[in-house]
Amino acid sequence: MSSEYRTGREGEFTYRGHTLDELQAMSLEDITALLPARQRRTIERGLTTEQQKLRETVRDADPQKTANDPIRTHLRDMPILPSFVEKTIAVYNGQSFERVRIEPEMIGHYLGEFQLTRTSVEHGQAGIGATRSSKFVPLK
């Protein structure tokens, strides 16, 4: 199975045969045609006003400024577009805003994919309120 993005011998990033500079020069309609089906449908149905506002904010932002003061958003369902590359966005995970630096390989994914909302639970030893059978731990 071939990858949709590659780095060539020179180390230049390509997404479906287009370099990053070409992608950033394209219109939204041209980029939409390259995206996977789910993201393409999201954009073709029309971005919400919040998503449009985020897109404009990220497009106009300076990459050096966003490194220190990231753009904060709750929009986990926003597809990552080429204009987002090299910017830092703080995505809300349900508890706090966590920084995500957008790399070229992230194009075509959703913002929420890079900030998990759940953590894996590692259970410790049985506590005071545990049942009698679960308290028993043989001494070694």
Curated annotation (Swiss-Prot):
Keywords: Ribonucleoprotein, Ribosomal protein, RNA-binding, rRNA-binding
Skewed-composition ranges (Basic and acidic residues): 52-63
InterPro entries per the UniProt record, alphabetical: Ribosomal_uS19, Ribosomal_uS19_CS, Ribosomal_uS19_euk/arc, Ribosomal_uS19_SF
A cellular-component GO term for this protein: cytosolic small ribosomal subunit
SS bond partners: none
GO molecular function: rRNA binding; structural constituent of ribosome
GO biological process: ribosomal small subunit assembly; translation
Record bears the keyword Iron-sulfur: no
Region span, Disordered: 43-71
Function, in words: Protein S19 forms a complex with S13 that binds strongly to the 16S ribosomal RNA.
Family: Belongs to the universal ribosomal protein uS19 family.
HAMAP family cross-referenced by the UniProt entry: Ribosomal_uS19
Protein name, per record: Small ribosomal subunit protein uS19
Species whose genome carries this gene: Haloquadratum walsbyi (strain DSM 16790 / HBSQ001)
Taxonomic placement: Archaea, Methanobacteriati, Methanobacteriota, Stenosarchaea group, Halobacteria
